[in-house]
Amino acid sequence: MGSNTSKVGAGAEKQQVYTPLTQIDFSQSLVSQLDSSKESDYVTKQNAEKFIEKKVSQRLSNLEVETLKKFEDTLNNSLLSDDDKDAVDGISSSSLNNQIESLNKKLTLFDQLELQKLEKYGGAKGKSDKKTDNGSISIKAKLTECLLANKGKPLNCYEEMEEFKKLVMG
């Protein structure tokens, strides 16, 4: 389709000359300078590409600096302040840390109370030992042995697991 129009035959090359309406005179020095110029089209093209690459890299570096600045500003604005005075709605990182510490203290106290209750009623102490009063192996030990015996295989410890659940729940 378009290939016939874009091909030029060997003998069909024509040189067209346009004559301007006004007379253009170039000085002899300009013509000799253009003739003696060592830059070819290839060199000119390479220089133009280098210039464009330089401008693009400058623009990219400017954009990178602007983007990083915007990101840092956004990040700094989104972080909670350390001071209680600057905090918005009473929330600051120091107040949140204090709340977390108080909750951790309450949890440890709760865990200690639960352990004391279990020890008081004999639930955890008597049943977690290796052997119970009648000499049979404890449920925890049975479950541990079953898990170790079936290491890397599908587990067949359903009964031991159910007994352990009963022990823990109750």
From Swiss-Prot:
Keyword ATP-binding annotated: no
Location of the protein in the cell: Mitochondrion inner membrane
Knockout-associated phenotype: Increases frequency of mitochondrial genome loss. Partially altered shape of the mitochondrial network with condensed, fragmented mitochondria accumulating at the periphery of cells. 20-40% of mitochondria exhibit an increased inner membrane surface and stacks of lamellar cristae disconnected from the inner boundary membrane.
Keywords, alphabetical: Membrane, Mitochondrion, Mitochondrion inner membrane
Domain of life: Eukaryota
GO cellular component, one term: mitochondrial inner membrane
GO biological process, one term: cristae formation
Membrane topology qualifier: Peripheral membrane protein
Chief location of this protein within or outside the cell: mitochondrion
Family per record: Belongs to the MICOS complex subunit Mic19 family.
Biological function: Component of the MICOS complex, a large protein complex of the mitochondrial inner membrane that plays crucial roles in the maintenance of crista junctions, inner membrane architecture, and formation of contact sites to the outer membrane.
Record text on subunit structure and interactions: Component of the mitochondrial contact site and cristae organizing system (MICOS) complex, composed of at least MIC10, MIC12, MIC19, MIC26, MIC27 and MIC60. This complex was also known under the names MINOS or MitOS complex.
UniProt miscellaneous comment: Present with 3550 molecules/cell in log phase SD medium.
UniProt name for this protein: MICOS complex subunit MIC19
Gene from which this protein is expressed: MIC19
